[in-house]
Every structure is written in structure tokens, then in C-alpha cells.
């Protein structure tokens, strides 16, 4: 049955200050009475004696401080009974407490509502309308228990995702471990009901003890709860714990948004941003203020804003107004973009992503990849062996054919070096006719044979000279064309290299400027903080100095005598409480009233 009860009332930070005061006083072999405790709290922590007394009485009611009657054994109070205060010892069984003492939401004491399933307690005002108590006769479950009860998730899959989150929690919890290592403090368990830290959370993740993401989130919130209770809401440790919890909630939100993106962004395989998700993200052209349109994936939409993640090197996230979003099918020439090297790389990544979409290529787990690789390797090895077997006989047969007919093929002419666009000149037809006619007359007589040989030699020389001139001209033209093409290619390469260098220099310049601005801002903040602290110290010193001067003036004023008639500094004494600054004032006061009340002996 649900019920409201006051578990504790004292402030946790005040309790720790009181513990320190009692411990210091006891170490000095003195009784920790109310006077010594109030003096210590006023001197060290600036707490008013009335507030100290109130917090001390509440701590006694909460059982966090033990009150006894002690008899003094030395000094002015020897033999006199006086109230003394002690730290609680091990006689109290703290392990039997089933519920926390402080609200899980605001971390403060007071009247709380107790959960029937777990150790958590809440103030009624800290609960939303959905979780507030409706009927006191029925059992009540806290928001954490209700959220854990709703979810059912694959443990193996959840463990993979939670390991990424825990690894980031460990990185961010380094400062928390440096700043706060008091969980071994003897009084730690008097304030913290259920202790937890990042190594404990990691161990539970590795052992698969979490049943849902909400249960993991509850442990992260418990870490924040314990830190605020033990170190205080305004402590540096509490700020680190808040940041750790906020980052953990952000990681869980990203996981719920898209599990594929969350896994790939943490595992970071090659081309991880190009793999399609299930379901696929909408592809758009997004335009940030001060930049042109850039290819991006839509992560979520909220009101008139669109959360996108850009293609490119850094894969940055941004909220873009919906009017600055264009569909990916829009013609790129209508967008008027500046085609820098970074933009081209982003478009290349977009094309690869679209190709993966067309091919239905999704990211697979390591076990599936190993199976496919083994199958492919076995198939490739078998095909390579078959290829070797089929190729070896062909090579031997070719060698036998070459040994039988070594000179069957004629050498190719030099015209093979000319490109296919050139026209190769042919031999003149009349020369071929002369050579044929002379060859047919060889059988008739020897004198015509000699004439034919001389004619053929002359014609062959003329043909060779004509071919040489034409081929020389063709090769010269081809050489000039190659030079011009080479020049144009060189200019293009140089131009692209200059553009790349310019874009890289602009990027480095922008990063340097941003870094310098951030450093200057940090330095300015540090200087402002120093100036504020210095002004505050000077102000306090000035107040102390003025108070001292005022006290001295009051003391000097009290030591003087003053005229009863005009209140100026007196010079003439009349009687026990009457003095005057001049004879005139004495006479005026004497005739007015003093002659009837003067006690001076005459």
C-alpha cells in the first residue's frame, strides 16, 4: 500500500559539516557540546547559530548524530552534566533499510512517496500528473519501475550498444574519479542507500544483467543522485555527474533514433556513413547559414526544423529550417553551389550511398562477413586451380605451333603506331601495274629482265621517298597534337592542385581562427572570473576596514563627555551626569531646570 512518510529532514551538506565539527572537537579531547559546534560552524562555514541548532536537532531525529549527557572532567565545567554529540557507530543496522531517504528526482529530504517495487522515493511535487498517487490503498510504482516493466529488448543486441555508451562514460568519468574518491568514507553509507559507480555499471553490462535501456539509464541517474547527496548540489563533482548523465541520455536518445547509425558511428568501419539504414533515411540538400547546399541524411523532423547529418569528412549534425531543405532529386544547377574539394568528396560519398541503396548492400555483422569471406576464398581458390589446369596445355600447344611455323606471320608495318583517326596513304596503282608486268616478262628473255629490274629499283626508291615524307608529316602532326594535349592536361592538373591547396588553406585558416577565438574567449572568461574574485575580496576587505573604523569611532565617542544642553563636547563638570561645554549653556540649563535637580554639594 502506498504511503507518504518523512524519511529524513536534515540537509545532507549540513550533516557532513556537523560530522566534521564533532570529529574535530572530539579529536581535541573535548566534549562536542552545542557551544563548540556552533562556534565551529560559524567560523568555518558561516552558518548562523540558530540554523546550526536547527540542523543539529533534525540530524538527531534522523539518527545521523547521537545525543548524550556527558559529565565534564576538567576545566570550569568539571563535574557538570552537559549535552554532548557523537557520530553514529556501527550499532545501527543500516543494511535493513529497504528504501532511500532522499527524493530520487530533486535529491532533497522531506515527505516522500515510497515505491512498492524498488528502493526509490519521490516527493509528490516532483512527480508528473501521470505518476502521482491516485489511490492510497493501492500499490504505487515509481516512474523508473514502470518504464523498465514496459520494455522488452534483445539482450545480446542491447549489450553491444551499451558497451559503446559505457566506454564513453568511462572517458567522461575520469574527472569524477579524480575529484571524488570519498565513497570509502566511513559515513558514506549513512547518506547513500545504493552505491554505484561506472565500473559497476560496466560489469553489469558485460554480464548482461540489464533488461532494458531504461534500467541502464536509471543506474546513470542513481550515480548522479548519490553524487549530489554526498558532495552537494553546487559542488564540482555534481556538475561532472550532471554532464555525465546528460551525455548518457543523449546517447540513448540517439540509439532510439536509429540503431544502425548509432552502431556504425561507434564501430566506424570503412565507408560507414554510406551503408543504408533500416528504414532508409531521406536524402536532401541542406543549407546552413553562411554555407551553400550540401548533401545530407534526415535524422528527424520537429515542427519547422529538420535534424540532418551531412555527408563529407566530419559528418556533422545540425538543425536546419525546413525552407532551407531541398529534395535530393533537385537539379544541382538550380542550387548554385560552390564546388569545393570538400563538397566533391561529400557528393562522392552520396553517390556511393546511392549505389549501396540500389544494390541492396547493408552492413552485416562480423560472423556473416567471416562466413561469406571463407566461402568466397574457397570458390576463388578452386577457380584458380581450374584456370591453371586449363591454361597450361594451351601454352604448350602454342609453343609447338611456333616451332613448326616460326616465320608464318609477317612483321607488322610501322603504321600501327599511328592513331585510328589518321588516314594512312596507300601505294600508287600504276607502280603496282608496272611491277606486275615486268615480273610476267621474266620468262621471255634476259634483256627485258634486266630492264625490269632497273625500272623496279627506280620505282621503289620513288615510293620510299614519298612514303617517308607523308609519314614524317603525319608523325609531326601527331607529335604537335600530343604536346598540346599534354600542355592542357598539365594546366588542368596544376589548376586543380591550386584549388585544392586553396581550399585546404581556407579550412586551416578557419580552424585556426575558431581555435584562436575559443582560446581568447576562454582567456577572457578566466580574466573576468579573476577580476570578479579580486573585486569581491577587495570589497570584503573594505567592509571589514570600515567596520573596524566605525567600531573605533564608537569607542572614542563613548569615552567622551557631552554637554547636557547643546550636546557638544563638554568641558565643565557639574554633577554626576551633567556637564557643559560653556558657562552660557550652564546658566541656561541651570535657570531652566537643573537648579531643582542638581546633586552637587554646595
From Swiss-Prot:
CDD domains: Bromo_ZMYND11, PHD_BS69, PWWP_BS69. Zn(2+) 1 binds at residues 563, 566, 581, 585. GO terms for molecular function: double-stranded DNA binding; histone H3K36me3 reader activity; methylated histone binding; transcription corepressor activity; zinc ion binding. GO terms for cellular component: chromosome; nucleoplasm; nucleus. Signal peptide: none annotated. It is linked to A chromosomal aberration involving ZMYND11 is a cause of acute poorly differentiated myeloid leukemia. Translocation (10;17)(p15;q21) with MBTD1. Intellectual developmental disorder, autosomal dominant 30, with speech delay and behavioral abnormalities: A disorder characterized by significantly below average general intellectual functioning associated with impairments in adaptive behavior and manifested during the developmental period. MRD30 patients manifest intellectual disability, speech delay, and subtle facial dysmorphisms, including hypertelorism, ptosis, and a wide mouth. Behavioral abnormalities, including attention deficit-hyperactivity disorder, autistic features, and aggression are commonly observed. This is Zinc finger MYND domain-containing protein 11. It comes from Homo sapiens.
Amino acid at each position: 500500500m502506498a504511503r507518504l512518510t518523512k524519511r529524513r529532514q536534515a540537509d545532507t551538506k549540513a550533516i557532513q559539516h556537523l560530522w566534521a565539527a564533532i570529529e574535530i572537537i572530539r579529536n581535541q579531547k573535548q566534549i562536542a557540546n552545542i557551544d563548540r559546534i556552533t562556534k565551529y560552524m560559524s567560523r568555518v562555514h558561516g552558518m548562523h547559530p540558530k540554523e546550526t541548532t536547527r540542523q543539529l536537532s533534525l540530524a538527531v531525529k534522523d539518527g545521523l548524530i547521537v545525543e548524550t549527557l556527558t559529565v565534564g572532567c576538567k576545566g570550569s565545567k568539571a563535574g557538570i552534566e552537559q549535552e554532548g554529540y557523537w557520530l553514529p557507530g556501527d550499532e545501527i543496522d543500516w543494511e535493513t533499510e529497504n528504501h532511500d531517504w532522499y527524493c530520487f528526482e530533486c535529491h532533497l529530504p522531506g515527505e516522500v512517496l515510497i515505491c512498492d517495487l524498488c528502493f526509490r522515493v519521490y516527493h509528490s511535487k516532483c512527480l508528473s500528473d501521470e505518476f502521482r498517487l491516485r489511490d492510497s490503498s493501492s500499490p504505487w510504482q515509481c516512474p523508473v519501475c514502470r518504464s523498465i516493466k514496459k520494455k522488452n529488448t534483445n539482450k545480446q543486441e542491447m549489450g553491444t550498444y551499451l558497451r559503446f555508451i559505457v566506454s564513453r562514460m568511462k572517458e567522461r568519468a575520469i574527472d569524477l574519479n579524480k575529484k571524488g574518491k570519498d565513497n570509502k568514507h566511513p559515513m558514506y553509507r549513512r547518506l547513500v542507500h545504493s552505491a554505484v559507480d561506472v565500473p559497476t555499471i560496466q560489469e553489469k553490462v558485460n554480464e548482461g544483467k540489464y533488461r532494458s535501456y531504461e534500467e541502464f539509464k536509471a543506474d546513470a541517474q542513481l550515480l548522479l543522485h548519490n553524487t549530489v547527496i554526498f558532495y552537494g548540489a553546487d559542488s564540482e563533482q555534481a556538475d561532472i555527474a550532471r554532464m555525465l548523465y546528460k551525455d548518457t541520455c543523449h546517447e540513448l536518445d540517439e540509439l532510439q533514433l536509429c540503431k544502425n547509425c548509432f552502431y556504425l558511428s561507434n564501430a566506424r568501419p570503412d565507408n560507414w556513413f554510406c551503408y543504408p539504414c533500416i528504414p532508409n533515411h531521406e536524402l536532401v540538400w541542406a543549407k546552413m547559414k553562411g554555407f551553400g547546399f550540401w548533401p545530407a541524411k534526415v535524422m528527424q523532423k520537429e515542427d519547422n526544423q529538420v535534424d540532418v547529418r551531412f555527408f563529407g569528412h566530419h559528418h556533422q549534425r545540425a538543425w536546419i529550417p525546413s525552407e532551407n531543405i531541398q529534395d535530393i532529386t533537385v537539379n544541382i544547377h538550380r542550387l548554385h553551389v560552390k564546388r569545393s574539394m570538400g563538397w566533391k568528396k561529400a557528393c562522392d560519398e552520396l553517390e556511393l550511398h546511392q549505389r549501396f541503396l540500389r544494390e541492396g548492400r547493408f552492413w552485416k555483422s562480423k560472423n556473416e562477413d567471416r562466413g561469406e569471406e571463407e566461402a568466397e576464398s574457397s570458390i576463388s581458390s578452386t577457380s584458380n586451380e581450374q584456370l591453371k589446369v586449363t591454361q597450361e596445355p594451351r601454352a604448350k600447344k602454342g609453343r609447338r605451333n611456333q616451332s613448326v611455323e616460326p616465320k608464318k606471320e609477317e612483321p607488322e608495318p610501322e603504321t600501327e603506331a599511328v592513331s585510328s583517326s589518321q588516314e594512312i596513304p596507300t601505294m600508287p596503282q600504276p607502280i603496282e601495274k608496272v611491277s606486275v608486268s615486268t615480273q610476267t616478262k621474266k620468262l621471255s628473255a634476259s634483256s627485258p629482265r634486266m630492264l625490269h629490274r632497273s625500272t623496279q629499283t627506280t620505282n621503289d626508291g620513288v615510293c620510299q621517298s614519298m612514303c617517308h615524307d607523308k609519314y614524317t608529316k603525319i608523325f609531326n602532326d601527331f607529335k604537335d597534337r600530343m604536346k598540346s594535349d599534354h600542355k592542357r592536361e598539365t594546366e588542368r592538373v596544376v589548376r586543380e592542385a591550386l584549388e585544392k591547396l586553396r581550399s585546404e588553406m581556407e579550412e586551416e585558416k578557419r580552424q585556426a581562427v575558431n581555435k584562436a577565438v575559443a582560446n581568447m574567449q576562454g582567456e577572457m572568461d578566466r580574466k573576468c572570473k579573476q577580476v570578479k574574485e579580486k573585486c569581491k575580496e577587495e570589497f570584503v576587505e573594505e567592509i571589514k576596514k570600515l567596520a573596524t573604523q566605525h567600531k573605533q569611532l564608537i569607542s572614542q565617542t563613548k569615552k567622551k563627555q557631552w554637554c547636557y544642553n547643546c550636546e557638544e563636547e563638554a568641558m565643565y563638570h557639574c554633577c554626576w551626569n551633567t556637564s557643559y561645554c560653556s558657562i552660557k549653556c550652564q546658566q541656561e540649563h541651570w535657570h531652566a531646570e537643573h537648579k531643582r535637580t542638581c546633586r552637587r554639594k554646595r
